[in-house]
Amino acid sequence: LPDGTIYIQKRSDSMLLDPKLGHIHFGFMQFVYENKQWFIDLANQIDDNRKDPITFFGEWCGPGIQKGVGISQIDVKRFFIFAIQIQGESPTWLDFSNIPYKRPNERIWFINMFGKYTLNANFNDAVTLLQQLDAITLAVENECPVAKEFGVSGIGEGVVWSGRDSDGMYIQFKHKGTKHQKPKGPRSSNPDVKIENPNIQKFIDTYFEKYNIYYL
């Protein structure tokens, strides 16, 4: 918040930063408390005259959190930021790849530090789109590029995609590999699906799972 107050949140709950509850969320509360000034400094750098809250979206990863993936084998837990939003009447998503933050933190990383994938998604052609997503996700599932940066070889869970539709609306979803999927509907690389009235959100809700995020 503009006054420096910090809340941590995941999909199921939200709470005020409290070091007495440092053990919750696999130690995420304690981690944020220890790095509180880092987040405040970054928020001030983004907008030191802000009147609205800033939210940092990210994945809390490391030993004891995820199971069976490469990122769970890195030496310590880390927070990987993949989106930043300024709240308010008209929320703004920031291009955080251009934030010239000069105070590095070994346990906080921006996801763009590990490269990215680009795709011109045609939601009118579900079959082709799923095939394109599957090909990229398969490569990540076979070898997690983030874990590899930390000297660990192991499988990846999936890819978080973000972008804008033809109307300029921001969209984001996670496409998981076959080893991590819990299908909500018909799912294969060649699904028999017809979209007469394309609806991106319905498409995502049908074929993809929501990503697990922690944000503050």
List each model region and its residues.
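Core nucleotide-handling region used for phosphoryl-transfer chemistry
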Residues: 1-216
